[in-house]
């Protein structure tokens, strides 16, 4: 089964655990664009895993959860993404993902499982240059594609 959306490193876990090694990474240059980037902890692995300790909370009038620490970290990542993608220090960014190829915020998506978290992130980004980023739940993202994701 050919996958054209993700880098082979990202496909490895689901391929091993769920697809019996039937997935084949066939992405274009965009799936390899971050390889070698100085913003990655491992420049050969185009994903950042970031554990964020925090407390799941709820508003009194809502059953949906949110985590303030996650909201603040997502905001920081989004602002850094805009800062770097907009040209300031973008030398460290791969050419394919500099502003001329990555439209910040239009090509960036933030995915979270909780509607309460969606609302908090949207509010946190509302006064920033990243206010146009699509922030949605997993269900809302089904079948949509962005060049870069910030999942929670």
Q: For each of these PLM feature ranges, what is it?
A:
Residues 1-80, 144-145:
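Helicase-core coupling region on the C-terminal RecA-like lobe
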Residues 9-12, 116-123, 146:
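A short acidic (Asp/Glu
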Residues 49, 111, 150-152:
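Structural motif
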Residues 132-152:
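Conserved RecA-like P-loop NTPase helicase motor core
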Residues 80-138:
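Conserved helicase motor "Helicase C" RecA-like lobe of SF1/SF2 P-loop NTPases
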Residues 2-4, 114-115, 152:
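A short beta-strand-to-loop transition that corresponds to the Sensor-1 phosphate-sensing loop
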């Amino acid at each position: 089964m050919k996958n054209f959306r993700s880098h082979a490193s990202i496909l490895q876990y689901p391929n091993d655990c769920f697809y019996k090694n039937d997935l084949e990474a066939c992405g274009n240059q965009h799936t390899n664009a971050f390889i070698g980037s100085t913003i990655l902890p491992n420049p050969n692995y185009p994903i950042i895993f970031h554990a964020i300790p925090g407390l799941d909370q709820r508003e009194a009038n809502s059953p949906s959860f949110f985590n303030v620490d996650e909201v603040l970290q997502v905001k920081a990542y989004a602002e850094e993404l805009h800062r770097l993608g907009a040209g300031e220090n973008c030398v460290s960014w791969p050419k394919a993902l500099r502003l001329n190829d990555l439209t910040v915020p239009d090509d960036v998506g933030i995915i979270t499982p909780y509607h309460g978290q969606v609302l908090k992130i949207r509010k946190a980004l509302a006064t920033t240059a990243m206010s146009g980023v699509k922030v949605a739940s997993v269900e809302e993202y089904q079948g949509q594609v962005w060049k870069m994701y910030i999942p929670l």
